[in-house]
């Protein structure tokens, strides 16, 4: 395939919900990701199309403990935690992540910066995946958090 290995990371993603609106119904996400001693606060807006998980994302490096304290003080509350091992590769202008998500299993995630034509970028990604034997129809738009919460609900 020719993909270049970029390393392995352990991610601990803690998601928060708003006291004013329910992110699960507005299709938004707010998380603090801890990776290798660094923490990043990320806000993800609503998905932009009906076939991919493309959405606006804004992130900034933070002190994890301070960011948690600020969110809690503002009334935000923890909505779930996702723990995963991520093996990263780069191929052309794509980032490929082989994820092993605790309690869920194995996944492949392919990203490309979509500063311009989203449809064109999606076509490139789906073409790449088809080369690996993964059909467009097999792709999922459900987030790891949604899957973790659904699995938790099924257990109760």
Across the structure, where does each feature detected by a protein language model lie?
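A structural signal for short, well-ordered beta-strand segments
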Residues: 58, 110-112
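N-terminal strand-loop-strand beta-hairpin
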Residues: 1-93, 132-156
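Mixed-charge, glycine-accented linear interaction segment located at domain edges/termini
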Residues: 116-141
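Short beta->alpha junction loops/turns
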Residues: 63, 113-115
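Short beta-strand/turn micro-motifs at beta-sheet edges
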Residues: 96-98
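Residues forming anionic-ligand binding surfaces in small-molecule and nucleic-acid pockets
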Residues: 101-109
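Short, surface-exposed beta-strand-loop junctions and turns on beta-sheet-rich folds
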Residues: 47-50, 104, 116
């Amino acid at each position: 395939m020719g993909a270049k290995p970029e390393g392995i990371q352990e991610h601990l993603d803690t998601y928060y919900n708003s006291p004013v609106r329910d992110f699960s119904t507005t299709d938004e996400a707010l998380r603090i990701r801890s990776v290798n001693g660094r923490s990043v606060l990320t806000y993800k807006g609503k998905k932009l199309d009906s076939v991919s998980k493309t959405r606006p994302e804004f992130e900034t490096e933070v002190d994890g403990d301070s960011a948690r304290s600020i969110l809690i003080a503002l009334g935000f509350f923890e909505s779930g935690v996702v723990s995963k091992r991520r093996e990263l590769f780069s191929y052309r202008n794509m980032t490929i992540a082989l994820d092993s998500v605790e309690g869920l299993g194995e996944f492949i995630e392919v990203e490309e910066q979509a500063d311009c034509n989203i449809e064109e970028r999606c076509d490139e990604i789906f073409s790449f995946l088809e080369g690996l034997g993964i059909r467009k129809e097999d792709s999922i738009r459900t987030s790891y958090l949604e899957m973790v919460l659904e699995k938790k609900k099924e257990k109760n």
